[in-house]
Amino acid sequence: MVTATIYHATPEQTDSTPDQVASGKFINMDNPLKHRWIAVSKDLEAKGLTFGVKVRITGIDTLDGIWTVQDRMNRRWNNRIDLLVNDSIQGGKWENVRVEILNDDNRL
């Protein structure tokens, strides 16, 4: 179980290149949510949540479903995921969110 939050592709919430995630992929800035990409804290990478891994997220109501790890969070965070969403979705923090790694066959 992890804590989940949302983030937007803006310099204030990312870095100087908000249109590119840590894996090197580029974000569709008109509709970032369509990618269903997440950022993960460094400690979760050691548990198998590495770039390209697909996961099933449950416990966030309308944002539940299949997402892909493509970004990395600031090192100050632990046991946390961040869902890339459109600017129209504001605020959100959920505790005890389940993240299930899907089979290697589901890797992008």
Model regions and ranges:
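Solvent-exposed, well-ordered loop and adjacent helix/strand elements within mature globular domains
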Residues: 1-108
